[in-house]
């Protein structure tokens, strides 16, 4: 799998195209699997495929919140997101295992379409708008697109492993 830095070397259009096909890629990986398989965790500490899809849906919402804030505000300080605790807390609080995978995927698709429409509508100078990320420091909108592109691929690999019963 490529690193975040390797994704940063791709053209912006290439990264946007990868983001556009993200929901289709997720759908292709989970297609044909029943709820029992999609709800099965590969081990005690890794997510079930259904939880991964719900996480991707929720991260897309967080991304749009951050992007719109970056356009509306000069160099906002973003609210902390502890990658070690927040995703697991969301999975529990939002009851990911009780969610319908198809509905979560449809919501992810809608949110991603909104994100792509927003991003494609930006003026060239707006791509350099930035925010202060709590752990990564100053990040531009372009940096967030790079990170989200990597994030999709990371979770696609996680989905494949989970469906194969591997952590």
Give the role of each language-model region.
Residues 16-18, 23-25, 32, 94-101, ...:
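Small-residue-biased structural context
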Residues 1-21:
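Extreme N-terminal tail/first-helix region
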Residues 17-24, 87-128:
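Acidic/histidine-rich alpha-helical segments that form the ligand environment
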Residues 28, 32-33, 41-43:
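A glycine-rich, hydrophobic loop/mini-helix early in the fold
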Residues 2-5, 39-87, 113-116, 120, ...:
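Short, contiguous alpha-helical
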Residues 11, 19-27, 60-64, 152:
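A general secondary-structure boundary signal
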């Amino acid at each position: 799998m490529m690193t975040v830095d390797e994704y940063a070397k791709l053209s912006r259009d290439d990264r946007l195209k990868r983001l556009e096909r993200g929901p289709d890629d997720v759908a292709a990986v989970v297609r044909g699997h029943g709820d029992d398989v999609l709800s099965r965790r590969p081990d005690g500490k890794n997510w079930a495929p259904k939880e991964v899809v719900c996480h991707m849906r929720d991260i897309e919402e967080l991304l749009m919140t951050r992007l719109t804030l970056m356009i509306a505000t000069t160099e906002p300080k973003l609210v902390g997101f502890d990658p070690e605790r927040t995703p697991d807390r969301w999975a529990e609080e939002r009851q990911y295992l009780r969610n319908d995978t198809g509905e979560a995927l449809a919501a992810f698709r809608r949110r991603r379409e909104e994100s792509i429409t927003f991003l494609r509508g930006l003026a060239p100078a707006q791509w350099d708008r930035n925010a202060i990320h709590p752990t990564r420091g100053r990040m531009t909108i372009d940096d967030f697109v790079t990170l989200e592109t990597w994030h999709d691929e990371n979770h696609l690999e996680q989905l494949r492993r989970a469906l194969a019963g591997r952590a």
